[in-house]
Amino acid sequence: MSQSNLIGLERARLNLPGTAATDDRTIDAMIGACSDAVVKYCKRDFFPRSYDEVYNGDGDRRLLLRAYPILSVESVRYRPVTVLKVQNTDTNTNQQARVTVTRTGLTLLRVASGVRSVDTSVTWTANPTLTAVANAVNALGNGWNAQVVGDGNDYGKWPSADLYLPPSYGGGTTSQGALTTRGQVAELKLHTYELQGYQWDPRGWLLRGIPYTDPELLHPEDLIWPVGIHNFRVQYTAGYPTIPEAVQEACAEWVAIAWNATLRDPALASLRVEAVGQTWSSLFTNARQPPPQVAALLAPYRRHAVGTNQG
């Protein structure tokens, strides 16, 4: 069973009496397709997984997270500040120079007389701290220069991998950049202030709370999330330890409809011979909706983002 499949073969067979072991490959492919369709229709994941996301403070008392139910919160940080500066000072040789933060490290690109050179040797694994990253960049030559901002004994010891922020949508592997560095400084930022005054609700949001020592709180009674663009970074775990039965049944029924469609012309909705007629559920009734019985089971689990700017 694939890690992304909402049900396994055994569960699917409960809705497919009469299938044989030789059908397993086809059924398994349908389980994968229907599981993906359920996730997209509900606009959410169901399996527990870790999230590392940035949010816009909106001046409200609640900060709505994208995934729920929340199982735990690792950290809530705010105030992104520059912690590492990268520059390419050899403007005579290099006509272009850029830095990009990726999942594995820094990508440093320079173009000299039309020749592109890309260096990916500065990895988080080999350089676990910001100081180590700066030293590795400085050792490259070719005009590359980097320095830790502020107290080297503080930011310099921060984990370099924290520079990377996974995209909240899609399968991208870059976050900051590409930022120009030719003759000017590219500032790489981190959310470095740990928020103490918060509480989390399993239903999918954070609340501001005591203590009142956080600088962002102007007044003790002003328990809101200050307005800003990507001014909060939240690391948390969300999902269902066990996939809800209704979601499993919805996936199984969708698989059964897809399977039965392979036993006839899938575009055939009904057939009548003299006084005998038969009508089938169709995969093509509404391109925007799953079959009605599937939609009814999934209705309580759909994510609605109306009224939030968090996506």
Residue ranges and their predicted role:
Residues 1, 60-67, 117-124, 285:
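Short aromatic-glycine motifs in intrinsically disordered, low-complexity regions
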Residues 2-81, 251, 275:
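Glycine-enriched, solvent-exposed interface loops adjoining structured elements
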Residues 16-22, 119-124, 240-242:
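Second-shell loop/turn segments in exported
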Residues 135-145, 172-250:
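Surface-exposed interaction regions enriched in Ser/Thr/Asp/Glu
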Residues 34, 130-137, 251-255:
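Amphipathic, non-membrane alpha-helical segments that mediate helix-helix packing
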Residues 2-9, 241-311:
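Short loop/turn elements at secondary-structure junctions
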Residues 81-196:
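Extended, beta-strand-rich, solvent-exposed assembly scaffolds of outer structural proteins
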Residues 39, 138-142, 260:
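Sec-exported extracytoplasmic/periplasmic mature domains
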